[in-house]
Amino acid sequence: ERIGRLPVLAIAIGIFAAMSAACIFAWGPASLIAFRFLQGIGTGGEVPVASAYVNELSGARKRGRFFLLYELLFLVGLTAAGAIGYLMVPKLGWQSMFIVGMVPVALVVPLRFFLSESPRWLINRGRFAEADKVICRLENSAIRHGQELPEPKPTAAVLVQPKPAGSVKEMFGPLYGPRTLLLWAMWFGAYMINNGLLTWLPTLYRTVFDLPVDQAIGYGFAMTGIALVASFICAMTIDKVGRRRWYTGALLFASIPLSTLYVLGASTPIMVFALATPAFAALQTVTYSLYLYSGELYPTRLRSLGAGLGSAWLRAGSIAGPWVIGLVMSGGSIAPVFLTFAAVAALTGLVVLRWAPETSGKALEELSP
């Protein structure tokens, strides 16, 4: 919020790549954990700032599609990382994956010289001439590629003046406080279930149902592949359906197959796969689009901060998921785990239904003054 989107992106990518290189030369578990922790700082800085940047460059009418097709690359990258690790690690060792992790450093130079700073951030900092140059450059590029520029829509007059970077205190003010709590509930609930399922189901297939390793891995790849298709459908339709309606429907829908697993006893691997997969896919459309919604519910001065603090609840939910699984399974049965996840999905869906504002088709300044 203080020095700009692109400088922070360059720094974060540099930290990530440098710590990838350091991990190659780790001399023990403690040093590897320390380097991975520092690498996580790079990732944690890059993702919310990049999401704010893309949000601020998106037009109101198709912002959801534009942003989520960008976010889809993240899911493709996760799938590709698993495939690359499967192929490389047995032959080249675990260090080879950190060599791959150094590749993003190649983005730093083009990032600084071929991309423009967010015009919304420039305006917010009072750098109007620079913002005008960026906007003119974008308009000229669109015209060169044969695109027609839509007529500007009339909006209420807004006094444009430089504003200081936002603060955590403002995030809990009268306007943004309820939005902050809503987003934190969504981040926590959706990621608690999805990351819980993602990490637990392969172990479940192996230890409870005694499936061969290759079959358990195959179930996992199939589940993530179906979730990838669901995410693409979400990207193409969320602007028409609307954020509030999509999130409510996805969360409440996910609770149905999860609760069905409890009722039926989750007694076979086919049953678990057939019912957990649609729930996971529905929730995946929520988790991967929350950076979009977070960026829409905060103004420019709070956008990166809000997304960053919101994603901290992503980590909290991801930690809570396996812990809840262990706690609930202490009775010896796996079925109550699915009931617990169903209850969390339903409760989060009702929270969204009651308190989530609709943002589709509206300019960011209209949504968050």
Residue ranges of model-derived segments:
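Transmembrane-helix signature of 12-pass secondary carriers
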Residues: 1-369
